[in-house]
Amino acid sequence: MTGTLYVVGTGPGSAKQMTPETAEAVAAAQEFYGYFPYLDRLNLRPDQIRVASDNREELDRAQVALTRAAAGVKVCMVSGGDPGVFAMAAAVCEAIDKGPAEWKSVELVITPGVTAMLAVAARIGAPLGHDFCAISLSDNLKPWEVITRRLRLAAEAGFVIALYNPISKARPWQLGEAFELLRSVLPASVPVIFGRAAGRPDERIAVMPLGEADANRADMATCVIIGSPETRIVERDGQPDLVYTPRFYAGASQ
């Protein structure tokens, strides 16, 4: 008899941003696998087992979790944000695809979570109100040339762009180079939003024009949203500015 593998996302980090469905999965699971900081967000019972590992061990982690679930254990794989957005759900599906036949019989439950770009957008207005895309700047699993091509094409097409994994100790130069590329395509006035820990006590949200965007404001936990030429900033007396992208496209019938 096989067990269950839950793949959950904790959201940006605040307990209020974790979905009830995820909370139910956490309550039901016996063993938990994930990156140290994500497991730290859970209040586990004494009878629940925690197995933490490094953030570059996704496939190994998925294989161990599937092995335990195939043995009849209720296992929970923990991601930050949404598990299907640059996170563990894809690694689990890859492991099932390439793994032994018994892994395909494991009950798989993936619970959606609040991903970083949605949390950051909600804190500043509605920058994702029209067409948008999400791009990871990490070149661990894809060439940098692919990333820059996608950035350029997305900017030329008028998408709002949410950047994940914008910078790390191993690649401190990439966000700056991405900004330079985007400045060659987009107006310097396009709003750029730096959002970190949205909804948590240590939240940091900053807005500036692309022409002044400084990559040093970001770290690996920052989500950077680059507006389109249609994105607007609304100044408000006594209230934070709003950033939004209109639902209609300029020149189209409204």
Curated annotation (Swiss-Prot):
Gene3D superfamilies from the UniProt entry: Cobalt-precorrin-4 Transmethylase, Domain 1, Methyltransferase, Cobalt-precorrin-4 Transmethylase, Domain 2
EC number of this enzyme: 2.1.1.131
Gene Ontology terms for molecular function: precorrin-3B C17-methyltransferase activity
Reaction(s) the record says it catalyses: precorrin-3B + S-adenosyl-L-methionine = precorrin-4 + S-adenosyl-L-homocysteine + 3 H(+)
Keywords: Cobalamin biosynthesis, Methyltransferase, S-adenosyl-L-methionine, Transferase
Organism, as annotated: Sinorhizobium sp
Family, similarity comment: Belongs to the precorrin methyltransferase family.
Family annotation (SUPFAM superfamilies): Tetrapyrrole methylase
Pathway: Cofactor biosynthesis; adenosylcobalamin biosynthesis; cob(II)yrinate a,c-diamide from precorrin-2 (aerobic route): step 3/10
GO biological process annotation, one example: cobalamin biosynthetic process
Superkingdom to which the source organism belongs: Bacteria
Protein name: Precorrin-3B C(17)-methyltransferase
Cystine connections: none
